[in-house]
């Protein structure tokens, strides 16, 4: 399937250890930073999702663009995040997003 003309795709990504953020550069020239602690990283066991152990900086540095730019992939962690969801502020399953929104304070 061909990409839509206006589809925002990742062209590069990297982990910034100093700020513990994921940087994503898109095909529209924009760059986005996402704190990695906001990303829900889980594994499926016995039909349940459980958090993975806290990843090391070395593991997080091994991130790449995947699926023609439609996803970000950590192979060693077996974690995939869709770019369109990340750009929409969706960092995990609905349950995770509810927990995240409960921790946000508005000044």
PLM segments and residue spans:
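Motif-centric detector for short Cys/His coordination patterns
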Residues: 1-107
